[in-house]
């Protein structure tokens, strides 16, 4: 009787342990599955966010191109027989009506840009001229103007005559922080934000204005400063990728998650970044490591 009772207890203990183990395993799998679902949801949200921001900015850039192309179709600009000073006067009047524009300028097909006071500037080596004279719309990364040392962005479009021959280039200079202003209100998590990188990795728009003014390049900085190595990898991955995606990176003691997408109008890269802890705290951090 004692043996049977002992055997019975042993069996109860064994089955109890098996049931407990099964319950724990099921619980762990459920937690892991839940974590994975949360991570996937956040990744999808961030990719969609980056894509949406890129599309909105493309819309604003293209709207400005349309505005510039409208001016480029003015008869006085298309007619090569109209004196250059008359063209300049016309563009000055248009500039006065638009607070966003700092300068509208006419450049002939030979690369001579005509300015106020019968001044002429050779711009045939400028990227914006070389693209527009081939029939392409172009927008520059922010740069320091040689005229007044201010930070500007230049939009350029070709000017066609009535026979659809390119007879010149119209340029529109705007504030170099215009793009930064466009993404200023984008917030992800609590402190996350958006920024834009140019084709070679220079900061085109960033909440830190100095990055834009000084053309901060995370990839180049990462070669000299090890604290930027992870940032440099993020920037390189984002710039050379053609599809939106999500990556993890770290800077000093902060682990962040970032999504990126391309702007079709310029080829620049939108990156949205925020500390991982701002999404799901310890649970999110653990999930990403699992």
Predicted feature locations:
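Output-coupling edge of small sensory domains
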Residues: 143, 157, 261-263, 277
